[in-house]
Amino acid sequence: MYDFDYIARSDGWLTSYNAAGLHGAVPVPGVSYAEAYFGKQNGRFINYWESDDSYDFGLKTESFRRFEKVSFYGKMQYRYFRGQHMSGSILLNPGDRPFDLVEFTPGTKTREQYILSGGVGFLLTKKLTGGLRIDYEADNYAKRKDLRHSNTMMDLNLSAGFVYRFAAVELGANYLYRKNTERVLCEQIGTTGENYDMFFNKGVWFGEKGLWTGNGMHLNEPGISGLPMKDSEQGAALQIAFR
């Protein structure tokens, strides 16, 4: 009896973005798993945007299914994170962009993450299979102390490809498309009269530091509410497998 991870690692096509490789690679009629998890993290050996006292929990399920002419992969996941004493970057994934926005008042932050993935590989001829795959993620992120921020992010990955099987060699090719959007809103709700600084990091900690006054710092400019960010990518990949 094999567990899910063992089967997922048994063939490179099962973890490839080219879902055409699914058909012919799933070694069993079907396998699934579901889990609930909880984690607790404490310690000061952290990066400037991380928490020294946090926890997270979530639910996750994955599945492979094989039929005569079609095979499927699916995944659903939910994750909740709560961290204390957090400041630093106000972006969801610092390091993914060529700039950063940094604030300096520690507070509690929460993040909710939703992930949905699916792939299908189908037989076109005896030697040729096609495939489609989608990976979708949505995140909400918020700080609950001034200077407060709230983020929404969407990450979408699409792939379409094929695999041609020779006697001892499999050749694959697929097209990749990715779209990522994130929007950040900042606000000050408290009436203590305290002033809050922000730093716009343009790279390797060169940039501009300013006093938050309800606008500026690229977060609330004339005609723009919040900081909208958008990335679009297209690409292609080739695969070869020897049997």
Go through each PLM region and give its residues.
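Outer-membrane beta-barrel proteins
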Residues: 41-45, 83-87, 141-145, 182-186
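Residues that define the transmembrane beta-barrel architecture of outer-membrane proteins
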Residues: 53-59, 110-116, 150-158, 230-236
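Flexible, surface-exposed loop regions and adjacent strand-edge segments
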Residues: 89-95, 146-153, 188-197
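Outer-membrane beta-barrel channels and translocator barrels
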Residues: 67-70, 123-127, 165-167
